[in-house]
Amino acid sequence: MSNMIVLIIFAAFIIYMIASYVYQQRIMKTLTEEEFRAGYRKAQLIDVREPNEFEGGHILGARNIPLSQLKQRKNEIRTDKPVYLYCQNSVRSGRAAQTLRKNGCTEIYNLKGGFKKWGGKIKAKK
């Protein structure tokens, strides 16, 4: 009986994770680095990594609004302009997109592979 409960909980968790991933893919468009470069200067560029990661290096022109603070700071992001998100490897940006969509953002883009795949200009704290 207890094995069955564990199996049901595990199956529910897997279904939740798949549903969350599918939803993220529907509400944000994942862009290649080339596509991302073509549009991010005309949009709001948000780095959702933590401050220590941001200070270690970030895309030139990005604002740091960590995922851990996004719900409290969501009003800093305009809903009438496109939002370009990135994190270290695209996991946190998907979760950030869900929060922003609930706040009214409709144009949300994500950097494929995240910052670790970025080959463009970066700024790092000295």
Swiss-Prot record:
Chain ranges passing through the membrane: 3-23
Would you say which domain of life the source belongs to? Bacteria
Q: Where in the cell is it found?
A: Cell membrane
| Sequence ranges assigned to domain Rhodanese in this UniProt record | 39-123
Membrane topology category: Single-pass membrane protein
Q: Name one Pfam family in it.
A: Rhodanese
Record-level GO cellular component terms: plasma membrane
Q: What is its main location?
A: membrane
Q: Which UniProt keywords apply?
A: Cell membrane, Membrane, Transmembrane, Transmembrane helix
Question: What CDD domains does its record include?
Answer: RHOD
Coiled-coil positions are none
This protein is called Uncharacterized protein YqhL
Source organism of this protein record: Bacillus subtilis (strain 168)
